């Protein structure tokens, strides 16, 4: 089962194209709409999104799907949600599309003149959680990403322990082309888990 966490600019409706492609992989999947997204009530805080991911995990577990049969998939902001959950439980695998190291590091790029370290409440500090993820990882990132620097995806990949796999695509931007090449890499990764 693939547990999918979408990015900041996303909602359930504009991820259907990805889910249609993922369906070809003959996997069960669950995509959640965080609080404050897709018409849901609440504020999308870091703690709130982590709580939403835990609720999804518990729901899958209550439906007899063990963590060892769950693959986490995060895109952009969702990578931080996936990394947080993955740092706490042993899942089958984790796929990160366009990951960032931390919100503090990312914000320093956009606002170098502000003391973001002091101003940011939601830190999404993925880079300091990844050492706890011992199960297989796939990091995917386009080298023309104009939102999250490609260097952050590479740094996340390099910081992970083995087993790890990468799919770095020349010419792709933040929303990677969800084409047969990308799907093939996901499929190969999933086959490695079996």
Model-derived regions: residue spans:
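Acidic catalytic loop of the alpha/beta-hydrolase fold
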Residues: 143-148, 174-176
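Post-His helix in hydrolase/transferase enzymes
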Residues: 177-192
């Amino acid at each position: 089962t693939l547990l999918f966490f979408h990015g900041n600019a996303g909602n359930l409706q504009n991820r259907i194209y990805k889910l249609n492609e993922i369906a070809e992989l003959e996997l069960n999947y669950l995509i959640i709409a965080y609080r404050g997204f897709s018409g849901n009530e609440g504020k999308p805080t870091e703690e709130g999104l982590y709580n939403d991911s835990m609720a999804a995990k518990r729901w899958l577990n209550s439906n007899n799907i063990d963590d060892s049969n769950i693959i986490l998939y995060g895109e952009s902001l969702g990578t931080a949600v996936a990394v947080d959950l993955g740092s706490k439980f042993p899942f089958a695998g984790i796929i990160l599309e366009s990951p960032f190291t931390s919100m503090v590091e990312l914000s320093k790029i956009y606002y170098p003149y502000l003391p973001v370290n002091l101003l940011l409440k939601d830190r999404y500090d993925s880079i300091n959680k990844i050492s706890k993820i011992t199960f297989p990882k796939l990091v995917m990132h386009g080298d023309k990403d104009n939102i999250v620097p490609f260097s952050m995806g590479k740094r996340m990949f390099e910081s992970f322990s083995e087993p790890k796999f990468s799919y770095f695509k020349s010419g792709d931007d933040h929303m990677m082309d969800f084409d047969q090449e990308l799907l093939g890499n996901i499929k190969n990764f999933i086959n490695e888990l079996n």
